[in-house]
């Protein structure tokens, strides 16, 4: 059943996911299942704004852990922030996602959004209270992981209202 649910989830078809949840004897168990890397269906859905309907369908199954971590410590918020899935980031923040969570490399969602130059997501995370001075495993702050070759000026205004330590 685990493989079936992940196959339906990764297909991107909301109707398939809803059907799985409606026909399952225990929909919450389907939502809480993990794959070999420890990722939940919510974490797989968090990778694309196109899957917002799937995220909402999964949450309708019952109490869903928006802060669940895979074996590397990644949360759904980190995945969505890295992927540029701004509507998923917004949904996760509205449903209690921890903006301060870091993975096994001490990388936060803000680090990921900054490194990919996802300006709107950086703003969302900062407004939600993300720590601009959080150090990752390489002692880098989010502002300093901005992808080289991209104009830093896009992100500087988002960071300017914060208490960034230089």
Annotate each predicted stretch with a short phrase.
Residues 1-24, 32-47, 56, 164-165:
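Intrinsically disordered, low-complexity regulatory segments in ankyrin-centric signaling systems
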Residues 12, 49-50, 84, 117, ...:
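Ankyrin-repeat intra-repeat helix-capping/turn positions
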Residues 21-29, 56-64, 90-97, 123-130, ...:
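Ankyrin repeat domain, specifically the short helix-to-loop turn at the C-terminus of the second helix
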